[in-house]
């Protein structure tokens, strides 16, 4: 920004710009000037880099050149989308004064601030992902979350009691923008959140102010009706969030009318590592489009259904009553034959959830209302389709009741909006002919201008005897009568010269001037009238807005249920039995994603876990299918807890509170953590937080360090989980020493993935069998990976020597392989003490034994 030089003052326009910019120092200020939004100084330089637009200059002000960049006003949305995707906040500064009446710069003011978490425009949003604004506050050990989807009006709060739980919630919510107090922002520096973190002064999180602000928004005396009176930390976060959106959006929010309380104990907790390893929305290779669970499951007909399905996946429920209602709904839809009619009807609904939010914010465009009109017209047909199903599903009945219809609003939109309106209301031609008599009259006046001008031209030609006379119009001079310079002497006395050209003269007459004033006034008045009618039309949505939102929610849920039913039929999924007894039983289970990517048939496998069989030690070759088997178990459990059918012949799923996975690892270079450090951090999280109701998947624990260290750690982790935590655990390993654990640890069982060797080539059978694997097939897998044959031959020779040497040392007493399960050898002093009978020793004998023990201790120290 320029320094103010009192000797060289800024121009009035730049003074206005700098005054407004000073109020928004951390945003890009788009300053409206005619048909462009201009950026100056540092903003111009940054916008030029981010948008790849030309950086120019606009003269000088206060003696300094003014860097400038600009974007056309009609292309604003496309540029905003690029800026928001890069995490920028943008202040839109519009001309609100009348240029004709302004002596100095036209009056301007910021009408809205667009931030990553407050976007509502369709062009700026990903259709199938929620765009969330979150606020996080910490008081003592309690973390309070508030989460707002401004595009739908959903406003949720949640409290958790640990940093690990807060991290898990942050991974689930995945906000586009996160508001935190300035002191808490320091804690989040090392977090892996992709959100734009917005540090705010502590007073934004003042509890009393938050309480007042929330009650004012909801029109209530207190917050008791929302069940959150005691959630002080979350309320502080919610107040901050509401203050922020009011400050940036500068409008009312009638679609935000309630707080919904979420409780972590009602859902299965998935930590960030688990969400990543299960590849719910993004594969481990970073591809978000393919080879993910959502890619297999999401065949929804609407964008709002797709967003709801993602919320299901990221927050699997523990409430068996609700899950069984969803299962019953799927069964009812399947029994009804899954007609394509319902799918087609849903596809015609569009994204009315987000359209309603734009209506509430008064930013809905004409084509939004056309789409909403179409959706309202389809509601009776959707209801009819549901009525044809049997009445066993209470959930489908409830959804059907929420679908309206809304005949009065539908009829109003049919009368009010033309068939194919322009994009913007300011372009005119949105309100249908016949809806408003005053508008029709103004349109008639301006619309018949052509006929009047044709008649005027013909009449003036006859009057002046000038056959080449013509009537024209331009934006600068308005309407005119034009004759050639050679015929100018024939112009009647009432012709008033308006413009002189090289070969022609242009004139105005009192009659033409009167017509011009009337027509231009009619056009302006018609646009103003149309805008007023449009605002009145949006107002008609306000009273039924809660019911319309319930309708949109019901359509989204119906879309998800219909989609899951179709997936179950197409992919041959079955309804899992949800049990109150701990354990998991899966017959012929399949990995939902892997089976869709294979050319060969997927090999299904069984799994049994129960009170007496709580841990499976899984061995077998690399690429044998251990990780697939483990992941498919977790995914089947997760699908069961969103109410979906599952890829298996039969499944019985007991209570689960958390799913943990530690599968694979990579260096965290940015965080300065090695592969082994990442592995141990994830393992520590499991050991601290797993319970007897948790499903734990551990793959190759200890492989990132030396053999003995890794084996020792793996053995200790298995023992702790089996003896202390008693979680349902799948533990894959190449440490064959661990296969002896079932002999001494109750509830631990060996499984292995089968493979066979044919002419020094390995064949993976991918079948799970009881018992430990017989060998690891490491060299065969290396050959399969393309390791040169001479390297494989040398490795095979080295392996034979190592095995022979180990065997020879063992039989010669040269040191057997470390046996972690053998009890530690007793110190000689222990044996002496065990043989003593203190009651039979004389004082002298006792003193001699004491010296003997001291001697043994000294000997041990010197060695």
From Swiss-Prot:
Single annotated GO MF: damaged DNA binding
Record's keyword annotation contains ATP-binding: yes
Record gene name: mutS
CDD domains per UniProt: ABC_MutS1
Family to which this protein belongs: Belongs to the DNA mismatch repair MutS family.
GO cellular component labels: cytosol
Task of the protein: This protein is involved in the repair of mismatches in DNA. It is possible that it carries out the mismatch recognition step. This protein has a weak ATPase activity.
Annotated TM spans: none
GO biological process, one term: mismatch repair
Binding site for ATP: 620-627
Keywords recorded for this protein, A-Z: ATP-binding, DNA damage, DNA repair, DNA-binding, Nucleotide-binding
Protein name: DNA mismatch repair protein MutS
PANTHER family to which the protein is assigned, alphabetical: DNA MISMATCH REPAIR PROTEIN MSH1, MITOCHONDRIAL, DNA MISMATCH REPAIR PROTEIN MUTS FAMILY MEMBER
Keyword Nucleotide-binding recorded: yes
Superkingdom in the source lineage: Bacteria
InterPro entries xref list: DNA_mismatch_repair_MutS (IPR005748), DNA_mismatch_repair_MutS-lik_N (IPR007695), DNA_mismatch_repair_MutS/MSH (IPR017261), DNA_mismatch_repair_MutS_C (IPR000432), DNA_mismatch_repair_MutS_clamp (IPR007861), DNA_mismatch_repair_MutS_core (IPR007696), DNA_mismatch_repair_MutS_N (IPR016151), DNA_mismatch_repair_MutS_sf (IPR036187)
């Amino acid at each position: 920004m320029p320094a103010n030089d009192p000797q060289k003052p800024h121009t009035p326009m730049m003074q206005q710009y700098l005054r407004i910019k000073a109020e928004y120092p951390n945003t890009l200020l788009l300053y409206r000037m005619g048909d462009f939004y201009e950026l100056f100084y540092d903003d111009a330089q940054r916008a030029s880099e981010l948008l790849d637009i030309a950086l120019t200059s606009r003269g000088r002000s206060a003696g300094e050149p003014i860097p400038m960049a600009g974007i056309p006003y009609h292309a604003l949305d496309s540029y905003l989308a690029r800026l928001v995707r890069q995490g920028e906040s943008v202040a839109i500064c519009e001309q609100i004064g009348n240029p004709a009446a302004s002596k100095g710069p036209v009056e301007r003011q910021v009408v809205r601030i667009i931030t990553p978490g407050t976007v509502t425009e369709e062009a700026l949003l990903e259709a199938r992902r929620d765009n969330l604004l979150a606020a996080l506050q910490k008081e003592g050990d309690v973390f309070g979350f508030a989460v707002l989807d401004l595009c739908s009006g959903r406003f949720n709060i949640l409290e958790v009691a640990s940093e690990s739980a807060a991290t898990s919630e942050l991974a689930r919510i995945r906000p586009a923008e996160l508001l935190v107090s300035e002191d808490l922002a320091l804690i989040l520096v090392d977090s892996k959140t992709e959100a734009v973190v917005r540090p705010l002064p502590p007073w934004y999180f003042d509890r009393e102010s938050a309480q007042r602000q929330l009650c004012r928004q909801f029109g209530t005396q207190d917050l008791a009706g929302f069940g959150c009176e005691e959630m002080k930390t979350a309320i502080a976060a919610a107040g901050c969030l509401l203050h922020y959106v009011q400050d940036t959006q500068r409008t009312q929010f009638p679609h935000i009318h309630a707080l919904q309380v979420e409780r972590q104990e009602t859902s299965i907790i998935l930590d960030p590592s688990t969400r990543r390893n299960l590849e719910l929305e993004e594969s481990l290779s970073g591809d978000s489009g393919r080879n993910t669970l959502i890619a297999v499951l999401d065949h929804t007909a609407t964008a709002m259904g797709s967003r709801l399905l993602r919320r299901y996946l990221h927050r699997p429920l523990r409430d068996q009553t609700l899950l069984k209602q969803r299962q019953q709904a799927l069964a009812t839809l399947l029994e009804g034959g899954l007609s394509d009619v319902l799918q087609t009807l849903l596809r015609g609904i569009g994204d009315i959830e987000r359209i309603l939010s734009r209506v509430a914010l008064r930013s809905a465009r004409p084509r939004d209302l056309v789409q909403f009109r179409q959706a309202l017209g389809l509601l009776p047909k959707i209801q009819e389709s549901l009525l044809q199903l049997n009445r066993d599903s209470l959930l489908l009945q409830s959804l059907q009741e929420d679908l309206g219809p809304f005949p009065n609003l539908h009829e109003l939109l049919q009368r009010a909006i033309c068939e194919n309106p322009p994009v913007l209301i300011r372009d005119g031609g949105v309100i249908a002919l016949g809806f408003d008599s005053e508008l029709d009259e103004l349109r008639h006046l301006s619309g018949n201008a052509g006929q009047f001008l044709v008649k005027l031209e013909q009449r003036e030609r006859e009057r002046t005897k000038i056959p080449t006379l013509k009537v024209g119009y331009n934006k600068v001079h308005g309407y005119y009568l034009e004759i050639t310079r050679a015929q100018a002497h024939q112009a009647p006395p009432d012709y008033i010269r308006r413009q002189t050209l090289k070969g022609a003269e242009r004139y105005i007459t009192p009659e033409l001037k009167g017509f011009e004033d009337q027509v231009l006034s009619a056009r302006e008045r018609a646009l103003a009238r149309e805008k007023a009618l449009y605002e009145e039309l949006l107002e008609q949505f306000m009273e039924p807005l809660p019911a319309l939102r319930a309708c949109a929610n019901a359509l989204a849920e119906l879309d998800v249920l219909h989609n899951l039913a179709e997936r179950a039929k197409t992919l041959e999924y079955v309804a899992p039995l949800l049990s109150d007894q701990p354990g998991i039983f899966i017959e012929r289970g399949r990995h939902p994603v892997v089976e869709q990517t294979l050319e060969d048939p997927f090999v299904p496998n069984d799994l049994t876990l129960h009170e007496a069989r709580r841990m499976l030690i899984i061995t077998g070759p690399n690429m044998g299918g251990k990780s697939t088997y483990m992941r498919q178990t977790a995914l089947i459990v997760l699908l069961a807890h969103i109410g979906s059918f599952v890829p298996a012949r039969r499944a019985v799923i007991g209570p689960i509170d958390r799913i943990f996975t530690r599968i694979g690892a990579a260096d965290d270079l940015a965080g300065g953590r090695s592969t082994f450090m990442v592995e141990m951090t994830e393992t520590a999280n499991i050991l601290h937080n797993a319970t007897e109701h948790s499903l734990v998947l551990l793959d190759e624990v200890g492989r990132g360090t030396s053999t003995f260290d890794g084996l020792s750690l793996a053995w200790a982790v298995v023992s702790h989980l089996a003896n202390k935590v008693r979680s349902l655990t799948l533990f894959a390993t190449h440490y064959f020493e661990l296969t002896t654990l079932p002999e001494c640890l109750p509830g631990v069982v060996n499984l292995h993935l089968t493979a066979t060797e044919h002419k020094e080539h390995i064949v993976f059978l991918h079948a799970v069998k009881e018992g430990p694997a017989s060998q690891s097939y490491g060299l065969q897998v290396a050959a399969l990976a393309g390791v040169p044959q001479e390297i494989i031959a040398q490795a095979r020779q080295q392996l034979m020597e190592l095995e022979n040497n180990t065997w020879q040392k063992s039989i010669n007493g040269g040191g057997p392989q470390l046996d972690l399960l053998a009890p530690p050898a007793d110190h000689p002093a222990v044996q002496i003490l065990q043989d003593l009978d203190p009651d039979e020793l004389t004082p002298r004998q006792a003193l001699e034994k004491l010296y003997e023990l001291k001697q043994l201790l000294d000997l041990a120290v010197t060695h």
